[in-house]
Curated annotation (Swiss-Prot):
<dbReference type="Pfam" id="PF00488">
    <property type="entry name" value="MutS_V"/>
</dbReference>
<protein>
    <recommendedName>
        <fullName>DNA mismatch repair protein MutS</fullName>
    </recommendedName>
</protein>
<feature type="region of interest" description="Disordered">
    <location>
        <begin position="1"/>
        <end position="24"/>
    </location>
</feature>
<dbReference type="InterPro" id="IPR007861">
    <property type="entry name" value="DNA_mismatch_repair_MutS_clamp"/>
</dbReference>
<comment type="function">
    <text>This protein is involved in the repair of mismatches in DNA. It is possible that it carries out the mismatch recognition step. This protein has a weak ATPase activity.</text>
</comment>
<dbReference type="InterPro" id="IPR005748">
    <property type="entry name" value="DNA_mismatch_repair_MutS"/>
</dbReference>
<keyword id="KW-0234">DNA repair</keyword>
<dbReference type="GO" id="GO:0005524">
    <property type="term" value="F:ATP binding"/>
</dbReference>
<dbReference type="Pfam" id="PF05192">
    <property type="entry name" value="MutS_III"/>
</dbReference>
<dbReference type="InterPro" id="IPR027417">
    <property type="entry name" value="P-loop_NTPase"/>
</dbReference>
<dbReference type="GO" id="GO:0005829">
    <property type="term" value="C:cytosol"/>
</dbReference>
<keyword id="KW-0547">Nucleotide-binding</keyword>
<dbReference type="InterPro" id="IPR016151">
    <property type="entry name" value="DNA_mismatch_repair_MutS_N"/>
</dbReference>
<dbReference type="GO" id="GO:0140664">
    <property type="term" value="F:ATP-dependent DNA damage sensor activity"/>
</dbReference>
<dbReference type="GO" id="GO:0006298">
    <property type="term" value="P:mismatch repair"/>
</dbReference>
<keyword id="KW-0067">ATP-binding</keyword>
<dbReference type="Pfam" id="PF01624">
    <property type="entry name" value="MutS_I"/>
</dbReference>
Length: 911
């Protein structure tokens, strides 16, 4: 989760004057601003003034700094200039994005009446304004503010105190798509559950937030937590409020929610109503998540494996980046959902794998589907914007385009023998509302404006009256010319003209001599109404011309009104189909992910894993999905594949544990991570980077690879290591997979060895889980003699002319040394240090063998002038050799000359 500065508390103490005192010193507009600001003190106030949103006082100072806009002043208060800045309404989304990403909440205050209406109440009356929406990180819907590849979750965290202790529940909503989920949680897995969902904003009761016993949790979550009054989580009225929102008489038959779940759900609904104010987004009914249905991955493991983002927060370098071949926003979001919550039911996993296998066998069909899907619209987000009154013509077009894609895919899949998951997708597509699809095709213009107020989005010939209004608006000159010709013919006055001015409007003009034709009979007088007489001309009008003038004058306004009415009708029809649209969008995402994973499997030569309920863990020629692709991009040496078999061996009841030794840089951490990632990929329903894989479902995955201090909570690297190790030992079951790298390295040798030794014994005897443990404590390899399911494996290395070559192969056996000095040499440590380290290591090893370690350490000489001199001589020798080699050109030497050169080099080496 991003660590950005939290400005919410700053806004509570802004020096905005009270709305009560000093009113006589403020303009009516500023009085109104202060009254509205007082109710929204925890948010920046976007105060609508014509075509701008304006901010005042500290709001202006803060916003100007973040947005990089000019800070100016408007008026004075108590003799001081009032700071002010503003942003154009048409560009507000861009500025909102910057403010939200910087940790601010924004209250959007709009004019709620026309200025003309305000004047009717008195010349000094000001336009009414109200806050119509609170914009927060978890409640945004605008396309510009959202990442199309990422869900935007608002989470509520409820705590219920009972006689037995505390009960917790989480609910999370993506207001932009309508997704609504809920689950119970427990103190020990609360952080893991939150990190799995990865919300943009978390709502908690203020009493919970300030509870010191949970301080560490909220320190980790940092700025994304928004404390609210405890009444938001009231469980007593929760069921009533939930039923009211979803128009239900009772929750019976919907779900048997716990009290804590009801509190979390109700809090989410109340917060949505609080922030959206005038609109209720169409949410799905809360779907309960079964905690046992998905692979549990704790927060530390999720971070260290870099599933969605790297430890530095980047998408590049993550597993998601390596496997994502989706072509739609919905598909990308579904892939993330699957990646963060792998399944634990083999039949459900196989259902997904069947889809991938189908598209691998039908590559032409897969290519055709991906071509149709590519660049497809984000229907759930479009329909949410429309339902919230924030949508435009292009959102309606997104629905129409989505329907078109569904129609095409339905025809493409109709005659195929499909696997279950894709058959279900096709079944959803078959219920396309064809009448609405046809109406949208007929209604929408080809060239659509961004905003509905710009008009012109309804196609000609769709609505007769609208066509007439547009004709009057756009073709008024032609209509007047036709009427002028009609009157000229009727009166036999060829010079008759229809003209216009701001006083009379449209009128007929003839000379005084011609006026007789319009006034000589009662019928003519009744038809042509006299308006004005000038020196040489007379002016008339007709009932027809007056009516036409009125119609022309109001044509543009009426055309816009009609177009907006049609827009609202279409929006209503679309929102009536919201359930289908969401199901169809989910089906499109499933199709996108299935085809994308098939493409990945073919491209990277992945295999289908066998998944069952056994304790098997057998990977043949497994590879690290991220590292392998990185090496290919760099045109480096190919990735070295390795086997891993933690399965139950003959005459044993439980699975094996591998104890991995070997040098740094040998590939131990990569091997550990790749097996964890293969497990996640297999259980999310993906093919995996191996030649074969058989995995008994893993219920919990623990991976402790890498280490860092947690300075914010005062924890050292070693303390963090011990906390994470405690979590593993306390919660791993026989169906779990544990990946541990260098346990005990953060303390003294004997302390570390003792802890690592005891932890391995505990995993073997108590947890009885599948595990791979990497260590530098070579003494631990002796444990295989007493623990019958513990096996020694090592990273293969090769000595070549005094240097070490890492082969990155895992083989049976134990390493006899760590090759730390050789790695230091590769890293470029000074020759003096390497020479000295080699000498110290040699003497320490001799001392350990003889049992005289401490004495030898005391006897070891420090760097001396003699040592330095020898090192300098060695350096000079290398320089001479280097110079000699630099002046040799092998292609120009005869065999005899080459032999002479070799002798000279040999002489240099002996000096």
């Amino acid at each position: 989760m991003d660590n950005k500065t939290d400005h919410k508390n700053d806004l509570n103490s802004q020096p905005v004057p009270s709305s009560a005192p000093h009113k006589e010193r403020l303009t009516p507009m500023m009085e109104q601003y202060i009254e509205i600001k007082a109710v929204n003190s925890d948010s920046l106030l976007f105060y609508r003034m014509g075509d701008f949103y304006e901010l005042f006082f500290n709001d202006a100072i803060e916003a100007a700094q973040v947005l990089g806009i000019t800070l100016t002043t408007r008026g004075k208060h108590l003799g001081e200039d009032i700071p002010m800045c503003g942003v154009p309404v048409h560009a507000a989304d861009d500025y909102l994005q910057k403010l939200i990403s910087s940790g601010y909440r924004v209250a959007v205050c709009e004019q709620t009446e026309d200025p003309a209406e305000a004047k009717k109440r008195g010349s000094k009356s000001i336009v009414r304004r109200d806050v119509v929406r609170l914009v927060t990180p978890g409640t945004i819907t605008e396309e510009k503010l959202l990442d199309p590849t990422r869900a935007n979750y608002l989470m509520t965290l409820a705590r219920i105190k009972t006689s037995k202790g505390e009960e917790f529940a989480l609910s999370w909503i993506d207001i932009s798509t309508g997704i609504f989920r809920v689950t119970e949680s427990h103190p020990e897995k609360l952080l893991a559950d939150i990190m799995r969902v990865d919300p943009q904003e978390i709502i908690v009761a203020d009493s919970f937030f300030h509870d010191k016993s949970h301080k560490s949790l909220f320190n980790v979550l940092d700025r994304i937590v928004s404390p609210q009054h405890v009444s938001l989580f009231d469980a007593v009225t929760a069921e009533r409020d939930i039923c009211s929102y979803f128009k239900l008489s009772t929750l019976e038959g919907v779900a048997d929610y716990s009290r804590s779940e009801l509190s979390a759900i109700a809090a989410a609904i109340r917060y949505i109503e609080k922030t959206q104010i005038t609109h209720r987004p169409p949410l799905m009914r809360p779907e309960r998540q079964n905690e046992n249905a998905t692979l549990f991955i704790d927060a530390a493991t999720r971070l260290s494996l870099e599933l969605i983002r790297t430890t530095s927060g980047q998408r590049d370098g993550s597993l998601l980046k390596a496997i994502d071949r989706t072509v739609t926003g919905g598909g990308s979001r579904l892939l993330v959902d699957r990646l963060i919550a792998p399944l634990t039911t083999p039949s459900a996993i196989d259902k997904r794998l069947d889809s991938i296998a189908f598209f691998l066998r039908n590559t032409s069909l897969a290519e055709a589907i991906q071509l149709i899907l590519k660049g497809g619209p984000d229907m759930p987000r479009a329909v949410s914007r429309l339902a919230l009154g924030r949508g435009g013509p292009r959102d309606i077009a997104s629905i129409q385009r989505g329907f078109e894609i569904i129609h095409g895919l339905n025809q493409l899949l109709n005659n195929e023998l499909l696997p279950q998951e894709i058959s279900d997708v096709q079944q959803v597509f078959s219920h396309l509302p064809t009448a609405l699809h046809f109406r949208l095709e007929q209604a929408l213009s080809d060239d659509l404006p961004l905003l509905k107020r710009d008009g012109g989005f309804i196609r000609p010939n769709y609505h007769k009256e609208l066509d007439e209004m547009r004709a009057l608006r756009d073709e008024s000159r032609l209509i007047i010319a036709e009427l002028q010709a009609q009157y000229a013919k009727e009166t036999d006055i060829k010079t008759l003209k229809i003209k216009h001015n701001n006083i009379l409007g449209y009128f007929i003009e003839i000379t005084n001599l011609q006026a007789t034709a319009l006034t000589n009979t009662p019928q003519a007088k009744a038809r042509f109404i006299h308006r004005q007489t000038l020196a040489n001309v007379m002016r008339f009008t007709t009932t027809e011309l007056v009516e036409l003038e009125g119609r022309i004058a109001h044509a543009a306004t009426h055309a816009m009104t009609l177009e907006l009415e049609i827009f609202d009708t279409l929006v209503h029809e679309i929102t009536e189909q919201v359930d289908f649209i969401r199901k169809a969008a989910e089906a499109l995402a499933i199709l996108d992910v299935s085809v994308a994973l098939a493409r990945l499997a073919e491209e990277q030569e992945y295999c289908r894993p066998k998944i069952d309920q056994s304790l098997t863990f057998r990977i043949t020629a497994g590879r690290h999905p991220v590292v392998e692709q990185a090496l290919r991009k760099q045109a480096a040496e190919p990735f070295v594949a390795n086997n891993c078999d933690l399965s139950v061996q003959k005459n044993h009841q439980y699975a094996a544990i591998w104890l991995l030794t070997g040098p740094n840089m040998g590939g131990k951490s990569t091997f550990l991570r790749q097996n964890a990632l293969i497990t996640i990929m297999a259980q999310m329903g993906s093919f995996v980077p191996a030649s074969s894989a058989h995995i008994g479902v893993v219920d919990r995955l623990f991976s402790r690879v890498g280490a860092s201090d947690d300075l914010a909570r005062g924890r050292s690297t070693f303390m963090m290591e011990m906390v994470e190790t405690a979590t593993i030992l306390n919660h791993a079951s026989s169906h779990s997979l544990v990946i541990l790298d260098e346990i005990g390295r953060g303390t003294s040798t004997f302390d570390g060895l003792s802890i690592a030794w005891a932890a391995v014994e505990y995993l073997h005897e108590v947890n009885q889980c599948r595990a791979i443990l990497a260590t530098h404590f070579h003494e631990m390899t002796a444990l295989t003699e007493k623990l019958d399911r513990l096996y020694n494996v090592t990273m293969k290395v090769k000595n070549w002319d005094g240097d070490v070559v890492f082969l990155h192969e895992v083989m049976p056996g134990a390493a006899d040394r760590s090759y730390g000095v050789q790695v230091a040499k590769l890293a470029g440590l000074p020759t003096a240090v390497i020479t000295r380290a080699t000498d110290v290591l040699h003497q320490l090893e001799q001392g350990e063998t003889a049992g005289k370690g401490n004495k030898l350490i005391d006897d070891l000489p420090l760097f001396s002038l003699k040592t330095t001199s020898l090192i300098n001589e060695e350096t000079n020798k290398h320089c001479m050799l280097h110079e000699a080699l630099k002046n040799i050109y092998p292609d120009e030497l005869s065999p005899k000359e080459a032999l002479e050169v070799l002798y000279r080099l040999k002489q240099l080496e002996k000096k």
